[in-house]
Amino acid sequence: MRERASTGRIYIQHVDHCNSHSAFNSKLATIRQSNLCLEITLPTKPLNNIDDKNGEIALCTLSALNLGLINDLHDLKELSTLSVRALDEILEYQNYPVVCAKKSAISRRSLGIGVINFAYYLAKNKVRYSDGSAKNLTHKTFEAIQYYLLKASCELAKEKGSCSLFNQTNYYLGKFPIDTYKKDIDSICNEPLHLNWNLLRKKIKKYGLRNSTLSALMPSETSSQISNATNGIEPPRGFISIKSSKDGMLRQVVPEYKKLKSEYELLWEIPNNIGYLELVAIMQKFVDQSISANTNYDPKRFLNEKIPMKQLIYDLLVAYKLGIKTLYYQNTRDGAEDNQNLNKSIENIKEDNCTSG
């Protein structure tokens, strides 16, 4: 924990949660590790050499739904169908230089569909990370996402057949994430299920699923720029984000700043990690892989500006208690100014090289 606090880069995976609350039957397909950003939890097997057909390299094909464009949860039905069908087709077109990677990708057909613009979505709906007001909305939203993703994959299985290793999933056994989630979540959110899961369960039992997994919440640090969206599920650090790359610097303003500036909850305005972690746990109730979630600390909130180990351990135990599978960065506020002169900065952001037509 000291190393995580000082570097921010000791990442945490609760492997027991990754197997007990998994898309896979842990007796047949054990989860042993994750990827760099910690949203992927897929089975792997060691290989003796690059041509070893008995090994398994996990591959997951990703996409994200822009929650900022969602006005009605029924909109997610068509979006989920398009996402599942598009990503499933990509699996056939990709080049696989390693045989045990191709075997995994084609036989499991694992997808990881996440979200971007969650902070904007909360602001639009006038709810916040820290005070519990976003819990029910988050529950309803991620229930709809997982339901429609599974429905789309089941319909695709009806057309093309289920993935060849579908029998290694919990879905094959009739066990869904809503059956295996950590029940401590019920103590923080009592929102009921709203969709017809029993009917979907019967259809999946009959037709199977085209894909072993459907959901994973990735950081979307770079890809969110294309849609001028806030990163993944994260609160923005400021109304203006400055992102650097090999192509230069990009200044990005949160969506609908002038209309919603009083509704956004910025990262360092959030008093502690608990409200955020509770929302992550509610998402994890439905997500069948994992979530790239962070913890954040402002030293100025603590005595002598030193974050006590007691606080770090407490947050870790809260995450574990609520069934959170993985924790990515530990961010510590470094004193840099997050909010520039907003009115002046926003006026000066122009598309200097943009031509019409």
Task: Say what each PLM segment does.
Residues S80-K102, R128-S220, S292:
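Internal maturation/activation junctions in enzymes
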Residues A23, T141, D338-N339:
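Short Asp/Glu-rich motifs
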Residues R4-A105, V115-N125, A229-G232, P236-Y264:
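Function-dense linear segments that define catalytic or interfacial modules
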Residues M1-A5, N66-L69, S80-V98, A119-K126, ...:
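Structural signal for hydrophobic packing residues in well-ordered secondary-structure cores
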Residues N49-N54, I70-E78, A101-I113, N125-A144, ...:
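Alpha-helix capping and helix-loop boundary segments enriched in small/acidic/polar residues
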Residues L38-T44, L87, L91-E92, N190-H194, ...:
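Catalytic alpha/beta core of large soluble enzyme barrels
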Residues S26-K27, S110-N117, Q146-Y148, K175-I185, ...:
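Short glycine/threonine-rich loop-to-helix capping motif typified by GTGT followed
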Residues H17-N19, F142-I145, Y172, P299-R301, ...:
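Acidic, glycine-rich active-site loops and adjacent beta-strand->loop/helix elements
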